[in-house]
Design a protein with these regions (language model features):
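N-terminal pilin/flagellin-like segments and related low-complexity appendage regions
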Residues: 2-301
Length: 301
């Protein structure tokens, strides 16, 4: 078979990287399927060329000899509105998947494609981010080495009104907020508790992948019974997620911006979280299917 071709959205390419890359990063081109339906928000395509044909505005059949093998027009096809060899981001000239014929039955496009959309990637990525943060928190709570024993307790969060510039220090007496980089105030509240994540090698949330991309989108809440300085952590002083009681800690990802949310103001919870999750201090949270008014992702213990 012919060599495969690949295109990736500028927002998702590796070199140079677009920052940030998170739930609000969208694909920048579209694909038209053989029926004429548009697949929007595409982040990458893998294209398998069909047999050589004469492109719409070409004078001869595609040349796939060694001399023409690096010219995409010798492999990829076009219609009057889409050119697979010369696509443009953020325009209607994206990609078109074959088979496509003209009114006389002549094949215009015989390229076939595998499409990767925003939803294909971002749902997995968001789940990985949430799980990583939860694992950091539970590993922290379980830490017991030498004179440091966290006794099953979790660190203070960073309050919503904290500056959006480093260092991101935990805020005293804050059981809901963003993820801190430094746990200074947790250690001041309970000197036997860790003051940093560095003693947990598996925890990477202080690294650039999280700090540059996800820090503003991820939140957590801890049950009052599991806050720093509490004694003998136990329920019933715990959180609730839907019908599930006795929850110690909840991690939430504010997914793609919904209508009415304005994330230039990063201090308002409702600009990131919806429903019960936007009123976190009552200890009641909800995990539900994605809709036009709700798209929070929750993981918890």
């Amino acid at each position: 078979g012919e060599r495969l071709w690949y295109a990736v959205s500028n927002n998702f390419k590796e070199n140079t990287r677009h920052l940030p890359l998170n739930s609000d990063t969208t694909g920048s081109f579209q694909v038209v399927d053989p029926s004429g339906s548009i697949i929007p928000n595409v982040i990458a395509v893998i294209i398998a060329p069909g047999p050589p044909l004469q492109r719409l505005n070409a004078g001869s059949v595609q040349d796939r000899s060694p001399g023409g093998e690096n010219n995409p027009a010798n492999y990829l096809d076009e219609t009057a509105s889409e050119d697979n060899a010369e696509f443009l981001e953020n325009t209607s000239n994206g990609f078109i998947s074959g088979i496509v014929r003209d009114p006389l039955g002549r094949i215009l496009v015989n390229d076939t494609m595998t499409v990767i959309t925003y939803d294909d990637l971002m749902r997995m990525l968001e789940k990985q981010v949430a799980t990583t943060v939860l694992n950091c928190l539970t590993s922290y709570a379980a830490y017991n080495v030498g004179g440091i024993n966290n006794f099953g307790r979790y660190p203070w969060a960073v309050e919503m009104s904290a500056p959006a510039t480093p260092p991101y220090i935990d805020t005293p007496n804050t059981v809901f907020g963003r993820v801190p980089t430094l746990l200074t105030n947790t250690n001041l509240t309970a000197p036997n508790m860790l003051s940093a994540w560095g003693s947990i090698p598996s925890c990477t949330i202080t690294h650039n992948w999280f700090q540059n991309n996800w820090r503003e989108h991820v939140f957590y809440a801890i049950a009052d019974a599991y806050k720093p300085g509490s004694v003998a952590p136990s329920c019933p002083m715990c959180l609730k997620v839907g019908p599930i009681n006795n929850v110690q800690v909840v991690v939430m990802v504010g997914r793609k911006t919904l209508p009415g949310q304005n994330r230039t103001n990063k201090t308002v919870i409702a600009n990131y979280l919806e429903g019960e999750n936007a009123t976190p201090y009552d200890g009641i949270f909800v995990s539900s299917a994605i809709s036009s008014t709700f798209n929070d992702l929750l993981v918890f213990k």
